Curated annotation (Swiss-Prot):
Pfam families tied to this protein: ATP-synt_Eps
InterPro entries (alphabetical): ATP_synth_F1_esu_mt, ATP_synth_F1_esu_sf_mt
Subunit annotation: F-type ATPases have 2 components, CF(1) - the catalytic core - and CF(0) - the membrane proton channel. CF(1) has five subunits: alpha(3), beta(3), gamma(1), delta(1), epsilon(1). CF(0) seems to have nine subunits: a, b, c, d, e, f, g, F6 and 8 (or A6L).
GO MF term set: proton-transporting ATP synthase activity, rotational mechanism
Descriptive protein name: Putative ATP synthase subunit epsilon, mitochondrial
Naturally occurring in which organism (per UniProt): Caenorhabditis elegans
Presence of keyword Glycosyltransferase: no
Record-stated family: Belongs to the eukaryotic ATPase epsilon family.
Transmembrane segments: none
Length: 54
């Protein structure tokens, strides 16, 4: 018999608890520095680069 069934849980409740634990383990704290997104664009005119922004 599987452990969650022996503990008196049904599969739905077991999966809810498991999902909650995974979310708690993977959640970053408020003080975790998040990487910044960068976007680079290049303007082209007649097949030649006109300007490049970073």
């Amino acid at each position: 018999m599987v452990a969650w069934r022996a503990a008196g849980l049904n599969y739905v409740r077991y999966s809810q608890i498991a999902a909650q634990v995974v979310r708690q383990c993977t959640k970053g704290g408020a003080n975790v520095k998040k990487p910044q997104a960068t976007l680079k664009t290049t303007a082209w005119e007649n097949g030649k680069m006109v300007s490049k922004s970073q």
